[in-house]
Amino acid sequence: AIDEAEDRERFDELLERCNIPRAPGRTVFNLDEALAAAEEIGLPVLMRPSYVLGGQNMIVAYNKADIIEYMGVITEHVDMDHPVLLDKYIMGTECEVDAICDGENFLIPGIMEQVERTGVHSGDSICVYPAQHLTQDEIDTMVDYTGRFARELHVTGLVNVQYAVSHGRVYVIEVNPRSSRTVPYISKVTGVPMVDMAVRCCLGEKLTDMGYGTGLHPNAPYVAVKVPVFSFEKLHAVDTQFGPEMKSTGEVLGIAPNYHDALLKGLIGAGYTFKTPGPGSCCIFTVKDSDKPCLLYTSPSPRDVDESRM
């Protein structure tokens, strides 16, 4: 199952059998193949080696220079017996699902939504349970796709699936037939003992006999926000830019009746400080050029943004 999820050709065959869409992608072994694939798919593209954890050696390439630099580094330091994976980068909302499977049925304790854009490693993104900005159709689609993966891969135990949602369509980013770093978080905030249940499934018990039901577990009556913690102030000469490679060294949890308060608790717990705004207060946004058009739609008062300084 692990090889089927990690090997690009076998994974594409799995998606075809399950009738599940994914971003266009190719496998490449050298620079010429990478440039040709990027031209065919269209920039930007997500590039990563096969069989990696923590987003190691992954980048989002926005131009040919990025591809040339990446392939030069990767072919020098990585075993090229396995190909480099090159996928179309989809800008959207990233979501994550951890599920327990007994070989027939599956249980999803909850769907998690990442605050940061797709392309930022999920371990470095603020994570929200339950998802705040998904439609019911998108939720139902994720539950359906997760069940198809669990059955087709014959998973007994835990499986992790990462999704990207763009313009109402759900795409699969990757499937990991194993435990993930979000299992302790989602177990704690939902009250579903995932590890205990997964072990019982491996020993032959059925989910229907464990008292938590199957499919998607009902949402808790509160919001839980996981905020990453970084150690940049202790590590010198470290690239602080977020991307597909994980850089956080810890995390904190904020729980409250609503999203706003849970997020505020989490940020304060992670060491951020906030001052109560007074008359004439302003907020300074530091945004790269390619993201500036989005700023007008995400700032609290778009009409108050000084576009002359953009």
Describe the function of each predicted region.
Residues A1-A5, E9, L14-C18, I41-P44, ...:
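ATP-dependent carboxylate activation and anion-phosphoryl transfer catalytic cores
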Residues A1-A5, P21-R26, S299:
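A short, GP-enriched loop/loop-strand-helix hinge that lies immediately N-terminal to
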Residues R26-F29, A61:
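Short acidic-hydrophobic, aromatic-tinged amphipathic segments that line or gate anion-handling sites
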Residues E33:
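Short acidic active-site motifs
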Residues Y297-D304:
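Conserved small/polar residues in nucleotide/adenosyl-binding loops
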